[in-house]
């Protein structure tokens, strides 16, 4: 399709007639107002790209290969030096290409202006692209079809149809698009290729005209006919400006009249005499489409006189075609006339169908059957095919009747029976068993329990009805509340109940096996006001007056304190139930006519309080004026005690505390009567490390910062010397407490930041020492690094003195300490390594001897221990002059022998004599 020409040609005989661009425009304009051009829904025939403004007819991407202006060309054959094309074709006896189909599903489908399958002719195009190929053109058009597309492409060796010719295309402007089949010719590079392509083109054009019973009539010169050049469309119809294929034909010494002449020759060769009908008879059969491609439906057998196209056979794919007549034509083809849904459609080649029913498939049988109750709505038919045209109605008319079988037929693997005086029905809809029928099946509401389990079962459907299967023994459900959801009566007169348990449908049971304890008929109207009884808030209400989890609507706590309107009552198994408006059913015992204080909340808390105002306050089992509250004691009974607050509740009269004492829960008291000295809000987060003060090992720690035996966790001694991690602190009544990780609460005064040594042991001993190393050593009030140890003096103060050792202690650091006295006065503690011990009792030995005080030594003294120490000086020996002294022990102290005399003490051996003086 060339661009808008500035001159064009009209062929008439051998005369050349030039037409200016102005004339073409005028004719096109005139054509556009011709009533014959007006088509309903004309926009359908305009390419989408043009409608959207993304393309124009002049610039649609197709046939835009040259901008050259066409020159005047001769009507018949230009003197180009090429042979006569038509003669060349005949002399070479070219064959024609096979018609290929590559239909593009993405192309839009729309009918011609006169309807589906009713083209009025054909438009001859050429591609205007010297370098393209037939596949390249098709591929490009397949992507850009919104700008333009045609029915087929032709080249030297192929004819490829890409769109059904029964539908229109977008190839030559809206007026041609509404009327014509359109075919593109791919350009050739040699004369021989051109001639071969023209041969294929003319054949295909003739084939299409013959297919649609259209004559060969050129519209090139007068705008009337069935064979149109694109150029003629421009000049006579409008809606386009292209002029192909005139210039391209002229390039090879060819013109449009030559082409129409070749079409006419091929068209005539296709014409044949009408076939005759050898027979035409009524038959009965059913078929479906087997091969839709290439087959159509005709008003009469095709190629017989008067045969016209009805529809492509594909229109009836998947449908049951009732074959009503069979005809054979002189060409040997057998044709079937068929109807669909009772309406006669037309004739089709029998080879295009698959026949699935003929009367020859039937066999004679005898037998009796009954309609399956579940198949009452299934229909029966005049023939063994589901076809609305022979539908005789539902099987329900014959419920319970004995049906006499006469014939059977297996149609597509499915067995059908013909019933006497009835018709055909699928065998699966009938049964040899006469089942009970359901006379009624209705929803009801009731509750029952098993009365007679023996011999009774649960069924999937009422027993003896179609499909009923035995389930478990009824005894499985003994003692359970069975909600009755449906009631059915069978034709045998038995009434059956369908029941559920806990919301799950179980099955059907004979009503005689049950005892029904609730039906709606037991209910009575009632008008009353009630309140949820305190203490009953956890009781539930239900959809019906039965405690069944499947209809449980939740606890009554949602309605505590609300005024409830009672509408109905029912006594179920001796127990009165109320139905509350907008609520449901609950036992009457859960409600009360008295309105108590309502608990707005009741929550666990942690606190400690003491009695602030005992006068006029009491302790109650529940918050005062709530349901079930009773007096426990006057509050004064707990004055001065630590009350642990464990719950807080709010009523319309105030806030109440529940408390315990010594771990025992006591009751509830008005919070205003107490002074709260601890709540968790008093706590603060801290970090730090502490150690147990050794002197506080017996002190206890607690679960909270309060000294309460109920939360006493034991003595701190378990944690001596351990680093304790602080987490929180609280000042309770002026006293600081610490919470220790993994431990609990302890008063801060029991801990220290210093890690003291602890005493491994501390025992009384007897010894005497003197200072060995004074330098760097001191005397302490306690062993150094023990809690409370204070320095007294330098050890050098006591150098040279006899230090009586009173006690020995060992600390956790491994050091051994001595507590000593000098002159009978206790001084302090000193590390043992700083001393030289010259006496210990271990130095003593037993001895038995008699001695006498030497006269010269009667003024010497004796001592409590073998050491000269004024603190243990017992006096002069003169008291015992002349007396016999019994020696019991001896000890050598610093090289000097001492004797211990019975009932006397120690004295140096030198003071005594073995002989009496």
Swiss-Prot record:
Residues 279-358, 361-435, 440-519, 522-596, 601-679, 682-756, 761-840, 843-917 form the GW domain. GO terms for cellular component: cell surface; plasma membrane. Keywords: Cell membrane, Cell wall biogenesis/degradation, Hydrolase, Membrane, Repeat, Signal. The keyword Acetylation does not apply. Residues 118-245 form the N-acetylmuramoyl-L-alanine amidase domain. PROSITE patterns: GW (PS51780). Residues 262-917 are annotated as: GW repeat region, necessary and sufficient for cell surface attachment. Residues 1-30 form the signal peptide. It is an enzyme of class 3 (hydrolase). Its main location: other. One of its GO terms (biological process) is peptidoglycan catabolic process. The keyword Ion transport does not apply. GO terms for molecular function: N-acetylmuramoyl-L-alanine amidase activity. Disruption phenotype: Decrease in lytic activity on L.monocytogenes and S.aureus. Decreased adhesion to mammalian host cells, however no change in host invasion and host intracellular growth. It is found in: Cell surface; Cell membrane. InterPro entries: Amidase/PGRP_sf, Amidase_domain, Glycosyl_Hydrolase_73, GW_dom, GW_dom_sf. Its EC number is 3.2.1.-. In the N-terminal section; belongs to the N-acetylmuramoyl-L-alanine amidase 2 family. A bacteriolysin able to lyse both L.monocytogenes and S.aureus. The C-terminus has 8 GW repeats. This is Protein Ami.
